[in-house]
C-alpha cells in the first residue's frame, strides 16, 4: 500500500514539475517584440552574409529603396529587392491578440531585431557574395495582391548581370497556404559557361531572456537530414560550432511556440545543411543546394520552398515527411501522435475544441478504466491484509529475511500481488503526460473559444474558475482515498497539500489544459464511486 502511494506521489510530483516548468516558460519575458515596422533603409541592419564566405565581414549595401509588398489570403509579405529576401511576414489568419485585427508578425526587421529569410545564388558565378554584395533586382511593380478566384500569385524579380546574363527570381504564393515557392530562372546569354549554387537561410537575432530566473520557451533552430530525422539546434550550440552536414533533401528551420519558418530544398537534390553566427549576433541556419553548370545559350531553373506559418502538422507533412516533427511531443511522441489525431477527429464533428478536449478525456479515461479498477482492487486487498502484515511484523521483529518469506507466503495464500496497484499507475502516467503535451503543442488551440467566459483555450482562465474547480475536484478525490494506518505522516501531509499546490500551478495555465485535468478528475471521482461500490459488495473496503 505504501509503495503504491509512493509511486502515485512521485508521479504527481513529476507532473507538477512539468506544469511548473511550462508555467515558467510561458511567463518568461518574450525575447522578441511582435509589433514593429519594417526598416526601409537597411544598410546597417541587413548584412550581405552568404554561406560561402566569411560572414563576420558583411559587405556594404546600397540602401533599400522600395520594398515589394505581397498580400494573399494567408500572408502579408514584404520582399527586399536587394537580394530578394523576405524581410517581413505577417500571418493574416492568425491575430496577435484575440478579437483584434492586427495579424501575428513572424518575420520582421527592426532597429533592434532581425528575423528574415534570405535566398540567393552563390558559387563561382553566383550573383550573391559577401565580397561583392547582393544582386539588385527590378520588379514591374511594388504591390502584388492575390485576387478573388486566383489560386496562385507570381512575383517576378529580374536582374541582368554585367555579362548580359538574365536572372529571374520568382516567388509563387498559393491560396490557403503558408509555403512559398522560390524559383530561379537563369538564361545564359553569355559566351562562357556558368556555375551557380542556390542557398537559403533564416537569420534571427540571438537575444537572451531578460530574466535568468525564468525558463524561456524553446526559440531556436532545428534541422533534418537523411541520417537525422529531427534535431533541435540551440542558439548557444550554434555559437560554439558551425553545422555543415551533407544530405539528400533535408530542411532547416527556426522554431518558436506555435509557429515555424523553414527552408525545404528539393528532396532529390544533394544539399548541405549549414549554420553560422554573424558578428552582429545573428544566428543563421539554412541549406546550400546542388551545383549547376549552365552552358552558353542554355536555360536553367533552380527551385526551393519556404514555409512561414503555424505548426500545422498536415501542411508541414505535405512539404516534407519529417517537417511535422517540429511539433515536438518529446519522448512520448508515439503516444501523442494518435492522441492528436483523435483530438482532431472529435473537433471535426463537434466544431468546438473545448468539447473535443472533454471527449478525448472521456475516451482516455474510459479505455483506462480496467487498469484503474485493477489498481483500486489491488489497493483494497492490500488494505485488508494490513492487520495480518502487522502481526507478521510483531512476530518476526527485526528478522527481515523470515518476515519477507512470511509475507510472500501470505500474498500467495491470499492471491494478492503487492505490486498490482503500481503497474496500472505506471501504465496510465505516460498516457496522461502525452495528452498534456498534445494540448500544449497544438497550435489549433490558440485563440480557440470554448463557452461562457472561456474565449481562448490557450490562455489562462481570466476569472480562475476552472483552476479552483480543478483544485476542489482533487480535494474530493483525496478525501475518497482511504489512508492506511501505517502510512508515513509526512506522506499524508504532502498528499493533503497536493490539491492546493496544483491549484496554484493551474491558476496561470492555459484553460484547455485545466479543462482536461478537471474533466479527468470528475471522471475519476465517478469511477472511484463505481469501483468502491463493487468492492464493498465483495467485502473489500
UniProtKB/Swiss-Prot annotation:
UniProt keyword annotation of Lipid biosynthesis present: no
GO cellular component, one term: plasma membrane
Membrane-topology annotation of the record: Multi-pass membrane protein
Transmembrane spans: 6-26, 349-369, 420-440, 457-477, 500-520
Subcellular location: Cell inner membrane
Gene Ontology biological process terms in this record: protein insertion into membrane; protein transport
Keywords tagged on the record: Cell inner membrane, Cell membrane, Chaperone, Membrane, Protein transport, Transmembrane, Transmembrane helix, Transport
Gene Ontology MF terms: membrane insertase activity
NCBIfam families noted in UniProt: PRK01318.1-1 (NF002351), PRK01318.1-3 (NF002352), yidC_nterm (TIGR03593), yidC_oxa1_cterm (TIGR03592)
Role, per record: Required for the insertion and/or proper folding and/or complex formation of integral membrane proteins into the membrane. Involved in integration of membrane proteins that insert both dependently and independently of the Sec translocase complex, as well as at least some lipoproteins. Aids folding of multispanning membrane proteins.
Protein family according to the UniProt entry: Belongs to the OXA1/ALB3/YidC family. Type 1 subfamily.
Subunit architecture: Interacts with the Sec translocase complex via SecD. Specifically interacts with transmembrane segments of nascent integral membrane proteins during membrane integration.
The name this protein goes by in its record: Membrane protein insertase YidC
Amino acid at each position: 500500500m505504501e509503495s503504491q502511494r509512493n509511486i502515485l506521489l512521485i508521479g504527481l510530483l513529476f507532473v507538477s514539475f512539468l506544469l511548473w516548468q511550462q508555467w515558467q516558460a510561458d511567463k518568461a519575458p518574450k525575447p522578441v517584440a511582435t509589433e514593429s515596422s519594417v526598416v526601409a533603409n537597411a544598410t546597417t541592419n541587413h548584412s550581405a552574409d552568404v554561406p560561402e564566405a566569411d560572414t563576420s565581414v558583411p559587405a556594404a549595401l546600397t540602401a533599400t529603396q522600395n520594398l515589394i509588398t505581397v498580400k494573399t489570403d494567408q500572408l502579408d509579405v514584404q520582399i527586399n529587392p536587394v537580394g530578394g529576401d523576405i524581410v517581413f511576414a505577417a500571418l493574416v489568419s492568425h491575430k496577435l491578440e484575440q478579437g483584434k485585427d492586427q495579424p501575428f508578425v513572424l518575420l520582421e526587421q527592426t532597429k533592434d531585431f532581425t528575423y528574415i529569410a534570405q535566398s540567393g545564388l552563390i558559387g563561382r558565378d553566383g550573383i550573391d557574395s559577401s565580397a561583392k554584395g547582393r544582386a539588385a533586382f527590378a520588379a514591374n511593380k511594388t504591390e502584388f495582391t492575390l485576387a478573388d478566384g486566383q489560386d496562385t500569385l507570381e512575383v517576378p524579380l529580374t536582374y541582368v548581370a554585367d555579362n548580359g546574363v538574365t536572372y529571374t527570381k520568382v516567388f509563387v504564393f498559393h491560396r490557403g497556404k503558408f509555403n512559398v515557392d522560390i524559383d530561379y530562372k537563369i538564361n545564359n546569354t553569355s559566351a562562357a559557361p556558368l556555375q551557380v549554387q542556390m542557398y537559403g537561410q533564416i537569420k534571427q537575432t540571438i537575444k537572451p531572456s531578460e530574466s535568468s530566473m525564468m525558463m524561456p520557451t524553446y526559440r531556436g533552430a532545428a534541422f533534418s537530414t537523411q541520417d537525422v530525422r529531427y534535431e533541435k539546434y540551440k542558439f548557444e550550440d550554434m555559437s560554439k560550432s558551425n553545422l555543415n552536414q551533407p544530405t539528400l533533401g533535408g530542411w532547416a528551420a527556426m522554431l518558436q511556440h506555435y509557429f515555424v519558418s523553414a527552408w525545404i530544398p528539393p528532396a532529390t537534390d544533394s544539399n548541405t545543411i549549414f549554420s553560422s553566427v554573424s558578428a552582429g549576433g545573428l544566428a543563421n541556419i539554412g541549406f546550400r543546394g546542388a551545383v549547376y553548370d549552365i552552358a552558353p545559350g542554355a536555360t536553367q531553373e533552380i527551385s526551393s520552398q519556404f514555409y512561414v506559418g503555424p505548426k500545422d502538422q498536415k501542411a508541414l507533412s505535405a512539404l516534407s515527411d519529417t517537417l511535422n516533427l517540429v511539433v515536438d511531443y518529446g519522448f512520448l511522441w508515439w503516444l501523442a501522435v494518435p492522441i492528436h489525431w483523435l483530438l482532431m477527429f472529435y473537433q471535426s464533428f463537434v466544431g468546438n475544441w473545448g468539447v473535443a478536449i472533454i471527449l478525448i478525456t472521456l475516451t482516455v479515461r474510459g479505455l483506462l478504466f480496467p487498469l484503474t479498477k485493477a489498481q483500486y482492487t489491488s489497493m483494497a486487498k492490500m488494505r485488508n491484509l494490513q492487520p495480518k502484515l502487522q502481526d507478521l511484523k510483531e512476530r518476526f521483529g527485526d528478522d527481515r529475511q523470515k518476515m519477507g518469506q512470511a509475507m510472500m507466503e501470505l500474498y500467495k495464500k491470499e492471491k494478492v500481488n503487492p505490486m498490482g496497484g503500481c503497474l496500472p499507475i505506471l501504465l496510465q502516467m505516460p498516457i496522461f503526460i502525452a495528452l498534456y503535451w498534445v494540448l500544449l503543442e497544438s497550435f489549433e488551440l490558440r485563440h480557440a473559444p470554448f463557452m461562457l467566459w472561456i474565449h481562448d483555450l490557450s490562455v489562462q482562465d481570466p476569472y480562475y474558475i476552472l483552476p479552483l474547480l480543478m483544485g476542489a475536484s482533487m480535494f474530493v478525490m483525496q478525501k475518497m482515498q482511504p489512508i492506511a494506518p501505517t502510512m508515513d505522516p509526512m506522506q499524508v501531509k504532502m498528499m493533503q497539500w497536493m490539491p492546493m499546490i496544483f491549484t496554484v500551478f493551474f491558476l496561470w495555465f492555459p484553460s484547455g489544459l485545466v479543462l482536461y485535468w478537471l474533466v479527468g478528475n470528475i471522471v475519476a471521482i465517478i469511477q472511484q464511486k463505481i469501483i468502491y461500490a463493487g468492492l464493498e459488495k465483495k467485502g473489500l473496503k
